[in-house]
């Protein structure tokens, strides 16, 4: 990641190396706290299959990541972008993850985050880079191991904090 908070991606050397972590980014847009859009970008489909779903209820954006299909040690990186009109402000009060794996492990806690706020064309664009810790799984021969995991990202607008 460079100083502006952007991630440089490269596919070079990504094939055939178990140590390479999949990098998947999703952008979520919230307009006036009542609508959302979802952008899916899988940058390394060889290592994992990741899909995002998003929903907004009472200005709360929740994104869930369904089961990860992987036969290698893996980690994932998510970029959450929230765009609001200048008349609204955003307050990040929680950015959490929770998993339940098929191996019996349960991980909960806060993401490590870096926030970059820009003002453009009457909107604030708040980009949050959230990085999950690695999810370790055994190197196996045969079908990929399916993790029964769900990551939840919660972002709150300022109006949600006062309601």
UniProtKB/Swiss-Prot annotation:
Main location, first listed in the record: membrane
Cellular compartments annotated: Membrane
KO phenotype (gene knockout): Hypersensitive to cell wall-perturbing agent calcofluor white (CFW) at 37 degrees Celsius. A similar phenotype is observed at 30 degrees Celsius, although the severity is decreased. Decreased expression of genes contributing to cell wall organization during vegetative growth.
One of the GO BP terms on file: cell wall biogenesis
Record keyword Transmembrane helix present: yes
Keyword Transmembrane helix in record: yes
Keywords attached to this entry: Cell wall biogenesis/degradation, Membrane, Transmembrane, Transmembrane helix
Induction per the UniProt record: Expression is dependent upon the presence of the cell wall integrity pathway mitogen-activated protein kinase SLT2 and its downstream transcription factor RLM1.
TM spans (from-to): 76-96
Membrane topology designation: Single-pass membrane protein
One Gene Ontology CC term in the entry: cell periphery
Function: Involved in yeast cell wall biogenesis.
Name this polypeptide is given: Protein NAG1
Organism whose genome encodes this protein: Saccharomyces cerevisiae (strain ATCC 204508 / S288c) (Baker's yeast)
Taxonomic path: Eukaryota, Fungi, Dikarya, Ascomycota, Saccharomycotina
């Amino acid at each position: 990641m460079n100083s502006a908070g952007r991630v440089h991606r490269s596919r070079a050397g990504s094939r055939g190396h178990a140590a390479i972590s999949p990098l998947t980014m999703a952008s979520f847009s919230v307009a006036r706290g009542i609508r959302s859009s979802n952008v899916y970008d899988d940058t390394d489909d060889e290592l994992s299959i990741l899909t995002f779903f998003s929903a907004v209820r009472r200005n709360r954006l929740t994104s869930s990541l369904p089961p990860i299909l992987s036969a290698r040690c893996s980690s994932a990186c998510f970029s959450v972008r929230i765009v609001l009109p200048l008349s609204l402000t955003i307050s990040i009060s929680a950015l959490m993850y929770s998993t339940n794996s098929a191996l019996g492990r349960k991980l909960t806690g806060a993401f490590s985050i870096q926030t970059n706020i820009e003002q453009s064309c009457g909107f604030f664009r708040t980009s949050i880079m959230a990085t999950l810790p690695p999810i370790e799984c055994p190197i196996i021969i045969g079908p990929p191991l399916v993790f029964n995991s769900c990551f939840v990202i919660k972002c709150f607008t300022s109006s949600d904090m006062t309601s």
